[in-house]
Amino acid sequence: MKRFLIITALLTVNIFPQWNTGAIKLGYFNPSATEGGFIIGFEGGKHFDKYMSWNWSADWFHQNYVDKKLMNELNQFYPGANGELNELRASTNIHDFPIMLGVSARFPISKRAQFYATGSIGGEMLIVNYRNFQNPTNDEFEVAFDFNWRVGVGAAFAISPGSEFFGEITYHESHPSWTYEDNEFYYPNGVLERSYNMSGFMTRVGIRFFY
């Protein structure tokens, strides 16, 4: 009996580190810099306790939009310009790639349902295609970077012993930017920064698998 209890205890200790997870997330992201749109992501993780896990995630958000703030500034500083020309100048196409590491804590509601809270930090790459000011038919290309963080809450419902359906709402914070020199309006050359406020709320649903 004593040997059986020892073996059971050892197996119990070893079970938790073997709980790997993989999740696909789909939803809506509404950052301050752009119009809201579809976001897709993958999250992997590993349980180090029955109700605690570390995780990593990678997301992709794409938006093709007209930068209203920039267009208003162009209309203000260049009132004689054609409105359609300034709208073309403000046309922007972005691809956002946040990559994060985090920790999640679960709180059981019932045998099949759980509430959870999560927090993550990481880095972000923003690929930006925007219009050349002098010749708006030509595209300019830049890559912006920043650190980011994210906090959120969600609820999960088991649909089988190895999978669950979940929904969550999170707040994401980041301001990817790049610097450039302006030799037209500044002498000596002025070093300026262009920043995109990619902070905002996202709501997502998905399926998580345990293996």
Question: In which residue ranges do the predicted regions lie?
Answer:
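Membrane-embedded beta-strands of outer-membrane beta-barrel proteins
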Residues: I24, I40-F42, I99-V103, A117, ...
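Predominantly the C-terminal beta-signal and adjacent terminal strand-loop region
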Residues: V66-D67, V151, A158-Y211
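Residues that define the transmembrane beta-barrel architecture of outer-membrane proteins
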Residues: N20, G36-I40, N93-I99, V143-W149, ...
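Cleaved targeting-peptide boundary
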Residues: Q18-L26
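Sec-dependent N-terminal signal peptides
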Residues: F4-V13
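Gram-negative (and chloroplast) outer-membrane scaffold detector with strong preference
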Residues: K46-Q134, I159-G162, M198-Y211
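Surface-exposed strand-loop-strand hairpins of Gram-negative outer-membrane beta-barrel proteins
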Residues: Y28-E43, K69, A144
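Extracellular loop and loop/strand-boundary signature of outer-membrane beta-barrel proteins
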Residues: G27-N30, L85-S91, Q134-F141, P188-R194
